[in-house]
């Protein structure tokens, strides 16, 4: 390897691949170091306290051939935590189904009725299944925005397997309410419940330094952070006005 007689094509390819991966790893290390420096030099900002905001917030759970028991279980846990806080009636939960299997859809409906019976007084829970799942998840959310979005100030878009604490949901609501220029606030998802060895390794690394990496990425982005597709609170009106994109042909 790498003999004095010259560098072969294979050796050139190895050097190129190592160089590319080194750049990627170095970028991640620099990003984490930036977050550490900020942590050490800037005082931690306390969570906002006081009277809660009056915004109406919709929790949206798009589902497509998911386990109804798991979805309703996570939804129930979030609703129960929200019910223990103030102004819980400002929140409503929507299960937005694109499921095609009639038997699975029937199971979803049964799980929904059970969920609605257990939710706290004043909290609305809805289930909607589209007959035609045009444009997949994007179309699912678009359908909700066009049909129900005008009744809510913000939407918290979740994945089918998302589980957020009531405190996290309320803090996202507080932060969005306090910053009138913010259109979207992205949370930092944390992996839980991994079963495989690789999944456990990812979960461990996510717990150890994932939050630092996320803070570093936020430093690069400043006020123009990206949307990861779930676990973020979004102001509905600006989203309706500016975020509809033409189909890519």
Where are the regions that the model predicts?
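N-terminal membrane-anchoring/stem segments of glycan-assembly enzymes
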Residues: 1-51
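Internal catalytic domains of large membrane-associated glycosyltransferases
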Residues: 30, 34-249
């Amino acid at each position: 390897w790498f003999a004095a007689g010259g560098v072969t094509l294979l050796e050139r390819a190895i050097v190129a691949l190592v160089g590319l991966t080194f750049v990627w790893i170095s970028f991640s290390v620099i990003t984490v170091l930036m977050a550490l420096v900020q942590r050490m030099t800037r005082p931690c900002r306390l969570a906002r306290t006081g009277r809660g905001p009056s915004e109406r917030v919709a929790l949206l759970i798009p589902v497509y051939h998911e386990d109804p028991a798991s979805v309703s279980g996570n939804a129930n846990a979030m609703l129960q935590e929200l019910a223990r806080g103030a102004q819980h009636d400002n929140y409503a939960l929507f299960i937005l189904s694109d499921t095609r299997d009639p038997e699975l859809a029937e199971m979803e409906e049964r799980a929904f009725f059970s969920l609605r019976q257990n939710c706290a007084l004043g909290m609305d829970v809805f289930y909607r299944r589209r007959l035609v799942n045009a444009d997949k998840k994007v179309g699912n959310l678009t359908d909700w925005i066009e049909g129900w979005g005008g009744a809510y100030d913000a939407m918290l878009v979740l994945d089918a397997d998302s589980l957020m604490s009531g405190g996290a949901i309320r803090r996202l609501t507080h932060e969005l309410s306090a910053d009138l220029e913010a259109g979207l606030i992205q949370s930092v998802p944390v992996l839980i419940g991994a079963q495989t060895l690789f999944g456990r390794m990812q979960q461990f690394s996510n717990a150890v330094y994932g939050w630092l990496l996320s803070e570093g990425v936020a430093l690069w982005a400043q006020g123009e952070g990206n949307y990861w597709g779930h676990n973020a609170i979004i102001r509905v009106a600006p989203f309706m006005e500016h975020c509809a994109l033409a189909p890519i042909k």
